[in-house]
Amino acid sequence: MGRVTAKALFLYNDPIATEALLGEAFVDAGFDVHTFEVVPAERAHFPARDVTFPDPTNYDVLVPLGARWPVYDDALRRTWVGEQMTMMRRAAAGIAILGICFGGQLLAQTFGGTVTRAPSPEIGWYDVESTDPLLLPGGRWFQWHYDSWTLPPGAIELARTATASQAFLLGRTLALQFHPEVDLELLDRWLADDEVGEIAASGLSHDELRSQTSIFADDAANRVRRLVHGFVTRVVGQPCPSS
């Protein structure tokens, strides 16, 4: 019999928050990439809805991606955010999880940390200092978030910016606050959806963000591959917790 290919499931918590560079890196690492749409485009302005999530045990890795909403929103916690938290608890017994921005905050909230509004947002390319560069390369990573987490009990912080925690490891779960997946194409989708002027309010322009991304994205793409390699070898490769 041939070798069974590992499967990674990317959860589209927002219709414009897709896997981009991160999906390419998982394919390069030998994974079949699958996706699941949590909030479809037609519900983006009314995102509270019940969702029946796939069985997490059918996958080797779950990747909950970003979203424009706060994970602590009451209407969302009563619907799909709460349902996704249940999925993550079930998955954590034997499946590796990589949470991205909103997805990382969801993991913090799921496993006993807190998520609240940060004193100031981080939007653009920020220097991230890593305490474990073989697992999580430091350097300039893209940010677009207004909230921040406190660590869940037992979690190990792996990275920070000057103002916020950026990554933690908890068993076979790795949470990231930044966006390793961003390339110019994905950024343009986000900028096209910037209806309320979040970028201008942060003191930047769309052109400035595009220019920064043109400068930093190629180096970030190389670090994304290293990040996925470290995640696959160090986190996915960990023994599952005993039942």
Q: Can you say where each PLM-predicted feature lies in the sequence?
A:
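Short, electropositive alpha-helical surface patch
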Residues: T116-E122
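Nucleotide donor/acceptor-binding cores
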Residues: A6, D60, G139
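Catalytic nucleophile loop
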Residues: M88-T114
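Amide-donor transfer/coupling interface in amidating biosynthetic enzymes
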Residues: F10, F53, T116, S130-S243
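Flexible gly/pro-rich beta->alpha loop and the following alpha-helix that scaffold active-site loops
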Residues: V27, F31-L98
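N-terminal beta1-alpha1 ligand-phosphate binding loop
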Residues: A6-F26, E37-V39
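Short glycine-/acidic-enriched loop or helix-start segments at secondary-structure transitions
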Residues: A20-L21, D73-A75, L107-T110, P152-P153, ...
